[in-house]
């Protein structure tokens, strides 16, 4: 069972990343990269307080964890579970997507 919750938007981000990787490289590469992102989300879920870097300038309490060429953005919920909000490419203007 996942140790985190994930937003609909983050699921869409994940799908778009997978689709882009299939179109650009291959399904095998897309599956590997998807697994890398899934592992990052598992790591966030295991220790959300100590994982990630603060991005309070975007949203108070927002944290980001670098995985491959993407940042997994999340907040820590009242129940101490991570809530994955977005998964964005490292070169994106993050503020535009929140």
Task: Show where each model-derived region lies.
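Arg/Lys-rich, positively charged N-terminal/basic patches that mediate binding to nucleic acids
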Residues: 1-36
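A generic structural signal for ordered secondary structure
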Residues: 18-21, 30-34, 59-62, 67, ...
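Compact soluble domain cores
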Residues: 38-42
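Short proline/glycine- and basic residue-enriched helix-capping loop/turn segments at helix->loop/beta transitions
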Residues: 45-48
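Basic/aromatic recognition patch in beta-strand/loop cores that engages polyanionic ligands
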Residues: 50-79
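Enriched for short, Lys/Arg-rich terminal
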Residues: 71-98
């Amino acid at each position: 069972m996942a140790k985190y919750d994930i937003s609909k938007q983050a699921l869409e981000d994940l799908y778009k990343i997978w689709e882009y990787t299939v179109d650009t490289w291959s399904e095998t590469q897309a599956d590997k990269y998807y697994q890398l992102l899934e592992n990052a989300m598992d790591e966030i879920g295991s220790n959300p307080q100590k994982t990630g870097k603060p991005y309070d300038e975007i949203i108070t309490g927002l944290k980001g964890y670098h995985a491959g060429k993407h940042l997994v953005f999340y907040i820590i919920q009242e129940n101490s579970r991570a809530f994955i909000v977005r998964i964005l490419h490292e070169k994106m203007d993050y503020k535009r997507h929140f």
